[in-house]
Amino acid sequence: MSISSVIKSLQDIMRKDAGVDGDAQRLGQLSWLLFLKIFDTQEEELELEQDDYQFPIPQRYLWRSWAANSEGITGDALLEFVNDDLFPTLKNLTAPIDKNPRGFVVKQAFSDAYNYMKNGTLLRQVINKLNEIDFSSSQERHLFGDIYEQILRDLQSAGNAGEFYTPRAVTRFMVNRIDPKLGESIMDPACGTGGFLACAFDHVKDNYVKTTEDHKTLQQQIYGVEKKQLPHLLCTTNMLLHGIEVPVQIRHDNTLNKPLSSWDEQVDVIVTNPPFGGTEEDGIEKNFPAEMQTRETADLFLQLIIEVLADKGRAAVVLPDGTLFGEGVKTKIKKLLTEECNLHTIVRLPNGVFNPYTGIKTNILFFTKGQPTKEVWFYEHPYPDGVKNYSKTKPMKFEEFQAEIDWWGNEADDFASREENNQAWKVGIDDIIARNFNLDIKNPYQGETISHDPDELLAQYQTQQAEIGELRNQLRDILGAALAGNKGAN
């Protein structure tokens, strides 16, 4: 049976269980099961490699001990074991990060995990179906990596916190252009399910890893932080799938939840798509300088990225149009960005890249810390011939970025080979300052075209609605700050 049909069968079985309500809970259920199965596959490999190997969790909780035998415990006995023994034990493991890092990973993964299934017989069917996938086979593991990404894409129900699955084509292009090297620290401060980190890991492995020592070095390079439990568990599983034995650097935390000035870390590479359109809970903004405080998540993350990048550190960040044209605190952040970093390229993405999750129009900002910006190159990414909008069934493809890759040039010579064309143009920093750091600069080589195509009109309408929502959030922030100021004055 193919892996994709195994996944479909899993979903069909879980739909029969009264305790599992909707795609998000199905994904949550599948996540902790997958985590334990993949974790135990790695345990078996580590046992073979090390003579006196010590298990990081009690042996009876390893997948092989209670789940691997298709004729093993089932029904109420299985439910009782999972709910009253397995979960309480793993949530309360004594596993210091320095002495038992793999145990620490398990404890973190299970900190807020939950068994939704109420029928032990159906749970046994799910477990037996999972056992049809052989994670010790590199071919099946690679295949499953692709399927895993598909699961994340299919099951994601985008909420109102602005978290959207980043299309693989966009992720690959960003990592390809940033080109992380062996030994460079690579971070995603809002890592979600780990798409950027997995892509960066694969990029370094495919281009720079030659020896076993290189592979060990690579395992230490990857850093991620995710504040929500389910994406954190999915990301940790994703890292295990990619061969990171001890993904302790994937933290279950809110990156913004400590004063900006207290960050000691200096990171070589940041690739991320921070949540946008959402706002942080009260008090988080107090971790930022008084004149730069806002509750808008994307603005706070951009400040954080500028702060934690090392000298000559490189970043690629997805940001909405609202960041480009926004005023107030957004203007101050863009001024800081151009003073502290060389914002050398902005790739303007077309409508629909994040369909069906949001119609907000987005951009990729590429910058390097240490030198101020002299000029910004813009590249307007066009739809391919015959495409009027992207959709879930017709997503963006990596090959579409070949034109940008061919045009890109080399940062070492200040991109001397770049030339303006119908899609690319540059704007000097003096012009940007004169525009009060409004970076929403239209392509001078493309005239305004009026379209009567219903698909395009619908896409434009969705974009406008999303931008109205973004402006509403900004206005709420400004009014909130003004009211808070008045209270302080009284």
From Swiss-Prot:
Keywords: DNA-binding, Methyltransferase, Restriction system, S-adenosyl-L-methionine, Transferase. It comes from the Bacteria. PROSITE patterns: N6_MTASE. It catalyses: a 2'-deoxyadenosine in DNA + S-adenosyl-L-methionine = an N(6)-methyl-2'-deoxyadenosine in DNA + S-adenosyl-L-homocysteine + H(+). One of its GO terms (molecular function) is site-specific DNA-methyltransferase (adenine-specific) activity. Pfam families: HsdM_N (PF12161), N6_Mtase (PF02384). Signal peptide: none annotated. SUPFAM superfamilies: S-adenosyl-L-methionine-dependent methyltransferases. S-adenosyl-L-methionine binds at E163, F164, Y165, T166, P167, R168, T193, G194, G195, E226. GO terms for biological process: DNA restriction-modification system; methylation. It is an enzyme of class 2 (transferase). Its EC number is 2.1.1.72. The type I restriction/modification system is composed of three polypeptides R, M and S; the restriction enzyme has stoichiometry R(2)M(2)S(1) while the methyltransferase is M(2)S(1). Belongs to the N(4)/N(6)-methyltransferase family. Type I restriction and modification enzymes are complex, multifunctional systems which require ATP, S-adenosyl methionine and Mg(2+) as cofactors and, in addition to their endonucleolytic and methylase activities, are potent DNA-dependent ATPases. The subtype gamma methyltransferase (M) subunit of a type I restriction enzyme. The M and S subunits together form a methyltransferase (MTase) that methylates two adenine residues of the sequence 5'-GAGN(7)ATGC-3'. In the presence of the R subunit the complex can also act as an endonuclease, binding to the same target sequence but cutting the DNA some distance from this site. Whether the DNA is cut or modified depends on the methylation state of the target sequence. When the target site is unmodified, the DNA is cut. This is Type I restriction enzyme EcoEI methylase subunit.
